[in-house]
């Protein structure tokens, strides 16, 4: 079984549905299936707005950057998934993804955002991407996805619109290579 947990999946150009030009960070991959978060499709909801909506009765004294909530995938689109650097805080529903990263689905992590108790780096997603047993492996063998080791800089620090090109460049691929490869296909 190929090891995909903690890796990036890069959508090949012929994927023209929800996953067109996406980069997915793989949070879980085992014999039951796979789950990941699209990291380069921001919604129109900022993390500051999300915090305010969830805590509308509380005084908002938090400091937020201008990070947006991303659309993590077409499954469970009303559910929040927070991918973050590991912390000393013990959140209720946290799953260790790699030695450095965890995913939390409980609201207690949201309560720390914008404060000194927040994880050092985090990505907030609504929805996730999931595959049944063997489904993702088949899609990879059908050349729907490229697989590459993830980089925290792309995951947390890079502008959303640059993440697809940057992930491809980890493999030495530049966008114009795809344009040339598409000539003659109808």
UniProtKB/Swiss-Prot annotation:
Record GO cellular component, one term: cytosol
PANTHER family per the UniProt record, alphabetical: UNCHARACTERIZED PROTEIN YQGE, UPF0301 PROTEIN YQGE
Family: Belongs to the UPF0301 (AlgH) family.
Protein name as catalogued: UPF0301 protein CGSHiEE_01530
